[in-house]
Amino acid sequence: MSITIQNLNKHFGNFHALKNINLNVPTGKLVSLLGPSGCGKTTLLRIIAGLENADGGNILFDGQDVTAKHVRERKVGFVFQHYALFRHMNVFDNVAFGLTVLPKSERPSKGQIRAKVEELLKLVQLSHLAKSYPHQLSGGQRQRIALARALAVEPKLLLLDEPFGALDAKVRKELRTWLRDIHHNLGVTSILVTHDQEEALEVSDEIVVMNHGKIEQTGSAEAIYRKPENAFVTEFLGETDAFEGRIEKGFWHYNGFAWKLDAQYKWQEQTATGYIRPHEWQIAAEHETPMICAEIEKIHAVGALTHILVKHDKQDVHITLAGSDAARYPIAEGKELKLIPKQVYVFSQNELIEYSI
């Protein structure tokens, strides 16, 4: 089922929570609403579900306007951060619950319900826990059961509100891979709310980056990461360091270093900020003009990566090198490091000037 959102607005008193939201979610895609707390992503999810009313605009499911329809009529499945499993019911009954409360005319037979629940428990790989109760399960197992329960009623749309937020990092990573596989197998149109950039980049077919009630950028995970359209998206999608430079004659200049801008973009001479991610630095060769010369303050090796903190012009700059690259150079605290970037994202007044191709 496709989702179309047209000119959606929502106020809470004087607070404008959603500002003219327009969005298309293609059939069968997993789309993440990504943004910081208070950006409007959960409010948008609740309006799509029918749990909240918009002040203006329309929501269409497969081209049919459902803006005024009750949540029960929208055939939506929910998975929340805190599971919402019934403590007094075992796993089997929790998964079956949505089917048992359907109107009599729509309710499957007991045999059909049993077959459906067994199928879903097999899908989430928890058939052996059918008789267990929620308090006997781990957090990851509870969330799998919550998803199985949401899928039991065969929703046309699956909505997930920070489903892994309460779990530890290792379990979150495991469940992200699992969710991606489940979605690939079922093909249910799904919308995931998250503030976790890594989660969105890993599981999504498309990402919608939100801030202050507006959509900043929509695109594939690769496009959002490789071609950010403004400074907010660049900074929100991972650690960056910012450098104030100037655009002149098709180059962004900083500290004697020049970064050539793409000729297809219009530019004018102006001040502009260059953003560089930690892993997009490299140590300058003898013949290269470095962008910065900085003293190493801290070195921290983590597995195959070496994280380096340097001080440049009273600014902390973060560098991440592959262990093999770090081993080729005499890196030590207190020594000077000459660096050039592999990529610079350049913006002027939050407007895109350059991105990687």
Swiss-Prot record:
Subcellular location: Cell inner membrane
InterPro entries, per database record: AAA+_ATPase (IPR003593), ABC_SmlMolc_Importer (IPR050093), ABC_transporter-like_ATP-bd (IPR003439), ABC_transporter-like_CS (IPR017871), CysA_C (IPR041193), Mo/tungstate-bd_C_term_dom (IPR008995), P-loop_NTPase (IPR027417), Sulph_transpt1 (IPR005666)
Pfam families in the cross-refs: ABC_tran (PF00005), CysA_C_terminal (PF17850)
Keyword ATP-binding set for record: yes
Tagged with keyword Transferase: no
Domain ABC transporter: 3-237
Reaction catalysed by this enzyme: sulfate(out) + ATP + H2O = sulfate(in) + ADP + phosphate + H(+); thiosulfate(out) + ATP + H2O = thiosulfate(in) + ADP + phosphate + H(+)
Positions contributing to ATP binding: G35, P36, S37, G38, C39, G40, K41, T42
Keywords: ATP-binding, Cell inner membrane, Cell membrane, Membrane, Nucleotide-binding, Sulfate transport, Translocase, Transport
EC number, UniProt record: 7.3.2.3
Superkingdom assignment: Bacteria
Gene Ontology terms for molecular function: ABC-type sulfate transporter activity; ABC-type thiosulfate transporter activity; ATP binding; ATP hydrolysis activity
GO cellular component terms attached to this protein's record: ATP-binding cassette (ABC) transporter complex
Disulfide bond sites: none
SMART domains reported for this sequence: AAA
UniProt membrane topology term: Peripheral membrane protein
Known function: Part of the ABC transporter complex CysAWTP involved in sulfate/thiosulfate import. Responsible for energy coupling to the transport system.
Family, as annotated: Belongs to the ABC transporter superfamily. Sulfate/tungstate importer (TC 3.A.1.6) family.
Oligomer and partners: The complex is composed of two ATP-binding proteins (CysA), two transmembrane proteins (CysT and CysW) and a solute-binding protein (CysP).
Name this polypeptide is given: Sulfate/thiosulfate import ATP-binding protein CysA
